[in-house]
């Protein structure tokens, strides 16, 4: 069975993306995989190791929280899904995973947490559009 | 998912897009509008003898031909399908139709007939992505 990747970062558009992905999955007969990408922590090498560890823990907590919220929506619709956490640059990681044979396409919110309010399309969605070789649904 | 808009220019990617749109529409019994937008011909101002109306009429006919070819390629369907040909700037016209008709999803080919092979995302898809406030599915 084919799967549809849903990019989740806990933001409102990404949760809307989950709902849209449920519809799309019903149409193309696919199962959902919710994906959270933890961006690399970029700090100067002199940073106290404990600080980096704490940041990484905080990131992992955020990932679990966002995935659980998204999974609740899928469960509410009477569906099941898999949860995936990746580490790396968000758009690139999603595009790489989308290369897998099982993947039909990717659903992503137009803007995540970091976008400026006046832009319609955030940088991750924009970049994913340009590098992904499978269908991409942008949800607003 | 009640109304789906598909934009087509007769390219392979847009035909694939139309297939996906029909597939998604089926379980929801959604209405599908297949739209072909022909760009206005721009001639230098010192060509006043050019029969613009006739040129545009023949361009609109070309759009209709693209639509009938697309529908023929998709074969018979039980879906509620309508078609529309419009003359205007392509991305802007698709966006305008999507928003005024409150479509639940807009489906586009990632690149049409004009795009260079090596680019993954054509200019029309890119522009619609940035302009449109409805969910957009780009199919490669």
Regions found by a protein language model. Give the residues of each.
Chain B
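Short, hinge-like loop/turn segments at secondary-structure boundaries
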Residues: 49-53, 100-102, 124-125
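Short secondary-structure boundary segments
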Residues: 36-37, 109-111, 140
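Small/aliphatic-rich secondary-structure junction motif
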Residues: 2-50
């Amino acid at each position: 069975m084919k799967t549809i990747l849903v990019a989740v970062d806990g933001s409102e558009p990404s949760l809307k993306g989950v709902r849209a992905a449920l519809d799309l999955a019903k149409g193309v007969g696919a199962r959902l995989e919710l994906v959270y990408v933890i961006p690399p922590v970029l700090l100067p090498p002199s940073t106290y190791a404990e600080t980096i560890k704490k940041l990484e823990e905080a990131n992992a907590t955020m990932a679990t929280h966002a995935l659980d919220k998204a999974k609740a929506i899928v469960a509410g619709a009477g569906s099941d899904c898999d949860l995936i956490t990746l580490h790396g640059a968000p758009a690139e990681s999603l595009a790489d995973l989308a290369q897998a044979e099982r993947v039909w396409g990717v659903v992503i919110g137009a803007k995540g947490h970091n976008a400026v309010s006046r832009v319609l399309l955030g940088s991750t969605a924009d970049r994913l559009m340009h590098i992904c070789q499978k269908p991409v649904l942008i949800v607003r | 998912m009640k109304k789906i808009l598909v934009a087509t220019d007769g390219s392979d990617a847009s035909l694939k897009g139309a297939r996906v749109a029909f597939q998604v529409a089926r379980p929801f019994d959604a209405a599908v509008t297949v739209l072909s937008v022909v760009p206005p011909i721009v001639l230098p101002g010192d060509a006043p003898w050019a029969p613009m109306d006739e040129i545009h009429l023949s361009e609109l006919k070309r759009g209709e031909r693209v639509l009938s070819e697309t529908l023929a390629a998709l074969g018979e369907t039980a879906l509620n399908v309508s078609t529309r040909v419009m003359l205007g700037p392509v991305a802007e016209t698709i966006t305008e139709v999507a928003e005024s008709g409150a479509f639940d999803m807009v489906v586009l080919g990632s690149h049409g007939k004009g795009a260079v092979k090596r680019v993954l995302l054509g200019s029309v898809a890119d522009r619609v992505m940035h302009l449109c406030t409805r969910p957009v599915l780009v199919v490669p």
